[in-house]
């Protein structure tokens, strides 16, 4: 009796895998957003969603980048819309690529500072200033959890 073995070169498997990823990215809706990691003293600002499928989950404030808009300009606009305040965009932190069930998210994250201390929640149901030790105390949206872990590990 012969033992038949099929040998498939690793590079061929990788090519098939890469093609499947490209196909999925083509099919899935692509969303590009920005997020503000607003720092004050030893804390960062987190907001709780008050709407949609991810209602009650926590995130860093921000939103979609409009066509022709730089990430920094989008961040200033989104914070003005969501929190009625002005920020300075200080330092790039990271870009997170995350596949949600219905879309692929690319999120550019920046450390930011408040230029005006007054904040008003226009879209969120709650907000908290969290120390790095408190970052695990809220239920983050999956992509934002990646960011929270990133900044916690960079201390």
Regions found by a protein language model. Give the residues of each.
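Short secondary-structure junctions
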Residues: 82-89
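Conserved N-terminal beta-strand and adjoining loop/helix that marks the start
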Residues: 25-44, 64
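N-terminal amphipathic/basic-hydrophobic helices that include classical n-h-c signal peptides
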Residues: 1-27
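Active-site-adjacent beta-strand/loop module that shapes the phosphate/pyrophosphate-binding cleft
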Residues: 86, 96-118, 128
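Conserved Nudix-box catalytic region and its N-terminal flanking loop in Nudix hydrolases
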Residues: 40-81
């Amino acid at each position: 009796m012969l033992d038949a073995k099929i040998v498939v070169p690793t590079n061929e498997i990788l090519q098939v895998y890469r093609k499947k990823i490209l196909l999925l990215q083509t099919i899935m809706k692509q969303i590009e957003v920005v997020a503000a990691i607003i720092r004050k003293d030893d804390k960062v600002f987190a907001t709780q969603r008050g709407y949609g499928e991810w209602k009650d989950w926590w995130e860093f404030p921000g939103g979609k980048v409009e066509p022709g808009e730089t990430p920094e300009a989008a961040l200033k606009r989104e914070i003005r819309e969501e929190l009625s305040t002005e920020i300075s965009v200080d330092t790039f932190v990271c870009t997170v690529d995350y596949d949600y069930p219905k879309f692929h998210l690319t999120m550019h994250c920046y450390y930011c500072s408040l230029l005006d201390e007054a904040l008003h929640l226009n879209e969120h149901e709650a907000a908290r200033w969290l120390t790095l030790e408190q970052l695990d105390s809220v239920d983050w949206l999956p992509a934002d959890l990646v960011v929270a872990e990133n900044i916690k590990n960079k201390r």
